């Protein structure tokens, strides 16, 4: 049985690609047709690719590996954080800071600062320091949590990367490839699939599409950790795909054009 159904994909708008004038020819094999200037992704291939990505991440998790979830575009930020936390994994959902993977020794010093500030507050140091200094320290803490909070417990390199939109996350992908870390990615019709080891051809602009697919990847990790079946994970998550309407394709894609 497939990890995800065609009905789920359709209701989440996963099949809507980018405008035909904004495409990468390497994605041709994942395109079903064109409609009103928008490429329609072949969901039969998406179902198959989701299965492949799911099984890979499940195996990574079974082997005790960790996955770094990356999605810094507005449509992905909430899902990336929520699903990574649900699965007990690492995440980056704000700006990717150069060296998170390739220069982690330096980045880890900044991560360590988070705990240092927390200990300062616990020990009552904020009560004796000048108020202005405390305000600045708290601002520093908020910045660190915003950009590095999702990797504060990452003591070693992740065994896999999951990204939403390879174009947006090209710096993260470049670092992962340099370190030979396998990459799973939601890849829209304007992206280069060659950069991704496990391609999930899908709409990377609709919030519901991103949420659905990111949730499935988190399920894979949980199944690997706990040895539970797909059905048990789905029942526990109790996803109701009918609670929101699919975002208008034209509006979503035009917003993406402006942001890029």
Curated annotation (Swiss-Prot):
GO BP terms, alphabetized: translation
One GO term describing the cellular component: cytosolic small ribosomal subunit
Alphabetical UniProt keywords: Ribonucleoprotein, Ribosomal protein
One example GO MF annotation: structural constituent of ribosome
Organism domain of life: Bacteria
Cited PROSITE patterns: RIBOSOMAL_S2_1, RIBOSOMAL_S2_2
Transmembrane parts of this sequence: none
Disulfide bond sites: none
Name of one Pfam family that matches: Ribosomal_S2
InterPro entries, alphabetized: Ribosomal_uS2 (IPR001865), Ribosomal_uS2_bac/mit/plastid (IPR005706), Ribosomal_uS2_CS (IPR018130), Ribosomal_uS2_flav_dom_sf (IPR023591)
Coiled-coil stretches: none
Annotated family: Belongs to the universal ribosomal protein uS2 family.
Protein name, as recorded: Small ribosomal subunit protein uS2
Naturally occurring in which organism (per UniProt): Staphylococcus carnosus (strain TM300)
């Amino acid at each position: 049985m497939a990890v995800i159904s065609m009905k789920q994909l359709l209701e989440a708008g996963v099949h809507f690609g980018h405008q035909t004038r904004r495409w990468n020819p390497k994605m041709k094999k994942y395109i079903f047709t064109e409609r009103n200037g928008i490429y329609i992704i072949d969901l039969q291939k998406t179902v198959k690719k989701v299965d492949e990505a799911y099984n890979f991440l499940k195996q990574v998790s079974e082997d005790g590996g960790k996955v770094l979830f990356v999605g810094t575009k507005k449509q992905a930020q909430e899902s990336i954080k929520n699903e990574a936390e649900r699965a007990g994994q690492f995440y980056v959902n704000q700006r990717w800071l150069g060296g998170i993977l390739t220069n982690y020794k330096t980045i880890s010093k900044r991560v360590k600062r988070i705990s240092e500030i927390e200990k300062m507050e616990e020990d009552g140091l904020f009560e004796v320091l000048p108020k202005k200094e405390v305000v600045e320290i708290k601002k520093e803490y908020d910045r660190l949590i915003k950009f590095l909070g999702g990797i504060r417990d990452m003591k070693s390199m992740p065994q896999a990367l999951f990204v939403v939109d390879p174009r947006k996350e090209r710096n993260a992908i470049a670092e992962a490839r340099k370190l030979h870390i396998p990459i799973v990615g939601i890849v829209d019709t304007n992206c280069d699939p060659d950069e991704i080891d496990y391609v999930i051809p899908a709409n990377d602009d609709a919030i519901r599409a991103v949420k659905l697919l990111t949730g499935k990847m988190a399920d894979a990790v949980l199944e690997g950790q706990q040895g539970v079946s797909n059905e048990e994970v789905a029942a526990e998550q109790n996803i109701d795909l009918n609670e929101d309407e699919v975002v208008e394709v034209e509006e979503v894609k035009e917003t993406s054009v402006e942001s890029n």
